[in-house]
């Protein structure tokens, strides 16, 4: 399903006549493969792996079923329409830390690609914090009011 979604995304980008100068991706397999499929379909060079695009470190929640989130993390959770977010499990990256990482991504892209359009293939939580940083929206508001699914296009967002 993921590869099919990536091919559909590439068609959608072509249909919208979006043009990208570079593609960056999380080094994790699924996001990187998605970026590679899209880059190839668009005639772009291979994606560049960028460690700051990796998904949030979930600490003790890593590998646990979503159903366990409330039991383990309550009351430090935020429930949104499609997702429950845990805020402070042991060893996890906090959303303020993730927001700072999102800002680092934007700063890096602005330095490396001034006046260019860059496609980022990343994961949900870091994607939301990049969006929060780019739009100066409070991170809690982004978690509750903003949702994007696999291979959704968010943007373009001008960060110059």
Residue spans for each PLM region:
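Active-site catalytic microenvironments for nucleophilic, acid-base chemistry
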Residues: 12, 37-41, 108, 112, ...
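Generic beta-sheet signal
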Residues: 116-124
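Domain-level recognition of soluble alpha/beta enzyme cores
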Residues: 135-160
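Phosphate-handling substructures
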Residues: 40-101, 157
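Glycine-rich phosphate-binding loop signature in dinucleotide/nucleotide-binding domains
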Residues: 16-19, 109-117
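Short beta-strand scaffold positions
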Residues: 25-26, 100, 121-122
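Active-site-proximal alpha-helix that buttresses catalytic centers in soluble enzyme cores
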Residues: 1-45
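Short, active-site-adjacent cap segments at secondary-structure transitions
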Residues: 30-32, 55-56, 126-128
